């Protein structure tokens, strides 16, 4: 008799050939004890900042670092991708970086306007859910008076739709 074929499925008597007995083998019912499992996925969240090349990249990087610091202060585990996306090459590098870090969910953060093609292609090339959010323009945190993240969010939304890509955009994505 195999260890998983105990005649009981989580304490309920069953036949040796029943689906429940076979299920015990799959859920690691070993030696009369069930290993605790959960159907809630373990999320390793990453954040990637994007910046249009005609805008100051430092603004996106500074805002991304502030979000990472705020998450760390609240005890939220967040991987901060050091590659800021301005073009398709940067997009591929950033996706490879977050994938190598083990991220399975991603926040694409528009620290300023953002490049529509590379930022939306992140959703295509990253193997996991992507949420798109943007920094508020009126937060006073601008470089040379530039911080057009709201307009970039509108373009991002439009381009995701045009490319038939799925990305999560919260009800209030700018803030």
Regions found by a protein language model. Name each.
Residues 6-7:
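Intrinsic disorder/low-complexity segments
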Residues 18-175:
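An N-terminal assembly and electron-transfer interface module characteristic of large anaerobic redox
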